[in-house]
Amino acid sequence: MKKRILDMCCGSRMFYFDKHDPNVLFTDIREYHDTLCDGRKLDVQPDMLADCTALPFEVETFNMVVFDPPHLQKVGQNSWLCKKYGKLPENWQAFINDSIHEGMRVLKTGGTLIFKWNEQQIKVGEVLKAITDYKPIFGHRTTIKNQTIWMAFMKW
């Protein structure tokens, strides 16, 4: 079966109802296994290792792309937050912009890119300023503090 959905930064697949959905190709730049300080297992086990800024796929391959990158810039390399969510590079603006462009490149015309962001350290307005050529159609805030934003981009 050909995968129709690409998750560019799957991490431990936290928000999926089916963590092994046959329609989704789960990619991440890392594979990682650990037990967190509270005893929970952390498994970052992508189907394929891939850099979201340089995806190894042809143009217009997927119907949907999911992009949930690391959101933290100020986090200790060995902290549980870094282990679980990853860490943004220092040049995070270029990383986000390049990743969105790559996601849109592999997205089919008429497809949707879902971008999830958490504002704990960097506000969504700053993130959107870093993205050239694309803007979300709509977004929705979730969580108790309204710090997580889900945004939908469309490829026309």
What is the meaning of each model-derived region?
Residues 1-156:
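Class I S-adenosyl-L-methionine-dependent methyltransferase catalytic core
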